[in-house]
A protein has these predicted regions:
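Conserved short hydrophobic interaction patches
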Residues: 42, 102-106, 155, 162
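Catalytic cores of nucleic-acid endonucleases
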Residues: 81-134
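Domain-level recognition of nuclease-like catalytic cores that cleave nucleotide substrates
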Residues: 114-182
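Intrinsically disordered, low-complexity regulatory regions of eukaryotic regulatory proteins
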Residues: 70, 84, 164-167
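Short, surface-exposed, charge-dense and proline/glycine-enriched linear segments
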Residues: 57-59, 76-95, 116-119, 139-150
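Hydrophobic face of amphipathic alpha-helices
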Residues: 6-19
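Conserved phosphoryl-transfer catalytic core
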Residues: 3
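Active-site metal-binding core of divalent-cation-utilizing nuclease and nuclease-like domains
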Residues: 16, 20-32, 37, 41-79
Length: 182
């Protein structure tokens, strides 16, 4: 089985790479393709051999069980076990089965899960790399957009800079409205 520290390090590295991925108004298929490209680029930057649509160790279910499933990206590393990556918009049991079979074969398994909602964590030893994407309806379907994390600044809470403030002892005394007589 693959070392947890190696898998965690690779998941964090890929997450850092995906943080820089941006796009506007892409379809679901286009987003998946863009993320697969980013994963392949990340792996290539590591100096690894990169294979797209590589055969999985898991066969397809009947009636196509004579054929193999494919992985979105598989990587051969000179300094460690192979790395396999699946990129999905939804949570599919079949993806988990495929990645678990790959982990049993000694590979580091990374699952890039993208979308706008909550993500269900996969079973160990699969590492999830989440990628938050905004969606909006369009007459042609749903379109997705993403800004890098660095551009998503926290909201400004006050437009006027505040100077020093004086502490006030609680409870506050009742206030008298202007024009009201006491």
């Amino acid at each position: 089985m693959v070392e947890d520290a190696d898998a965690d390090r690779l998941a964090a590295s890929l997450a850092g790479r995906l943080d820089a991925v941006t796009f506007t108004d892409l379809t679901t298929d286009q987003v998946t393709a863009r993320l697969i490209d980013a994963v392949a680029d990340w792996a290539g930057e590591q100096g690894w051999r990169v294979y797209r649509r590589a055969p999985s160790v898991l066969p397809l279910p009947p009636p196509m069980s004579a054929r193999q499933s494919v992985l979105d990206v598989a990587c051969a590393r000179p300094d460690g076990p192979p790395v396999v990556v699946e990129v999905d918009h939804g949570t599919r049991r079949r993806t988990w089965e495929k990645l678990l079979a790959e982990a049993d074969a000694g590979r580091v398994t990374l699952w890039v899960r993208w979308g706008a909602g909550r993500f269900t964590a996969p079973p160990p030893p699969i590492r999830m790399v989440s990628c938050a994407v905004h969606r909006r309806p369009d007459p042609t379907g749903v379109l997705h957009s993403r800004r890098p994390r660095a551009d998503r600044l926290p909201p400004v809470h006050s437009a006027v800079p505040q100077g020093s403030v004086d502490a006030v002892e609680l409870p506050l005394p009742p206030t008298v409205s202007p024009g009201a007589e006491g």
